[in-house]
Amino acid sequence: MRSFFLLFFLIFSYGSAGAENLKPSRGIIATSNPYASEAAYEIIKKGGNAIDASIAVQLVLTLTEPQATGIGGGAFMLYWDTDKAKLFSIDGREKAPSKAGEDLFLNKDGTKIKFYPDAVVGAKSVGVPGIIKLLEEAHKKFGKLEWAELFDYAIELSKNGFLISPALHNTLGYLNYLKTVEPAASLYYEENLKGEKIPLPVGYILKNEEYAKTLKRISLLGAKEFYEGKTAELIIQSLRDADKNSLMSLDDLKNYQIVWREPLCGLYRSYNVCSMPPPSSGGLTMLMMLKILEDFDIQKLDPESREMVHLFSEVSRLAYADRAYYMADPDFINIPSEELLNDKYIDKRRMLIDLNKAAKTVKNGNPFENIDFGKNVDISKPSTSHFVIIDEEGNAVSMTSTVEGPFGSHLMAGGFILNNELTDFSLMPEIDGKKVANRVEGNKRPMSSMTPTIIFKNGEVYALTGSPGGTSIINYVTKSVIGLLDW
């Protein structure tokens, strides 16, 4: 947990003093990539706000962190509007194509197909992307600068090239199937003297002209171009080339809509901790963990002690057990959010914890009657990107975006990676005769673990946090919250 405080200090030091002319009072920028941070800084310098800067960041991350995120994927955004004193949550999660059915990841005998590469690589795993729609809708409602201006940095960087990072290079090194999928193989690998494909080296200047063209079209024509124009056609063509029976259609792209959802908030140690509601499982699972932990005097425990590690592990197991059964797309499933956070239910779950030994098995609870789902069966590989921005007016963004696994489906269109988000659904639609809440259904959003979070104290923004990491995201963010508020 001490490493968390070091990270917290570095992030906020960079945001307040890392840019030459950016005074502490003018804003905070914390991203996973220096190019993205610079793009955001340039927007803030021009008078843009947190939303404007977020758009610039995401467009650059698509280029520089294709292994983790991109406009071919989805995102959740929390936005604090300081003038309105209101928190907004925007759901830009991908959706399953309308023709997708619960047997999407099943063999003919009803068993689940092999996860990698069968389920991941190719058209089968690709959901309808949501990021561009999210960014445009946020900009229409809150942005200050012109839409096209927010694309300039990413377009120029795509044309002139960026330095391959160690993170990108290392990911390329272990994805054997990516070497066989074009155009990604030709873009991110080179041949050695033996004719073997090897990752481009750290520091190599990589240009992406196709992505520059895509950004230029969207900058001029807006999200409509992505969902109905040439970019939409390129997406469908890429899927058809990979699988002639690909399920996604132009209508699926055209009909995609984001959802403005009510933020999910709860008190912890007198602070108001807010995150995303379902289809993210992050906010609900984190708040369950915090409510269970609040009854323990963990401030007296060493963060790295055996007692604290044991307690956190047991709390996490209890919350994740409920997550596996009850969380999914709320537009399809009645999720017992209030019941899962009910004090009496939390007390029952807390009483299952033995401070001296780990439970042999942890079962889901029963938050209310007449709810009976099978256990979610999915495999999530660590990926994703998170960033936070506060502008000089105090507006704040906490946003997590992803293409799901490393390099998503491995397919590309218009210079960007297409997600493999549908593997976030349960691979098995039914367990022991019970339907799984997070099963595949047409137009449904898969459950996510992304947990963008904003913490408030006395009605004002106190801290912003979030993380990459697949299903471990929830644990990471919960640890950062208790690290900040308890220690």
Where are these regions (language model features)?
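Noncatalytic scaffold domains of N-terminal-nucleophile
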Residues: 20-38, 42, 50-221, 226-228, ...
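Glycine-rich phosphate/pyrophosphate-binding beta-alpha loops
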Residues: 274-283, 384-388, 398-410, 466-474
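Sec-dependent N-terminal signal peptides
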Residues: 4-13
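Short, small/polar residue-rich loop motifs at catalytic or cofactor-binding pockets
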Residues: 260, 381-384, 448-450
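Boundary at the C-terminal end of the N-terminal hydrophobic targeting segment
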Residues: 15-19
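Active-site rim segments in enzyme catalytic domains, especially the processed small/beta chain
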Residues: 63-67, 74-89, 246-249, 395-463, ...
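Internal maturation/activation junctions in enzymes
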Residues: 183, 295-402
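M16/insulysin-pitrilysin zinc metalloprotease superfamily fold
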Residues: 283-299, 455-463, 470-487
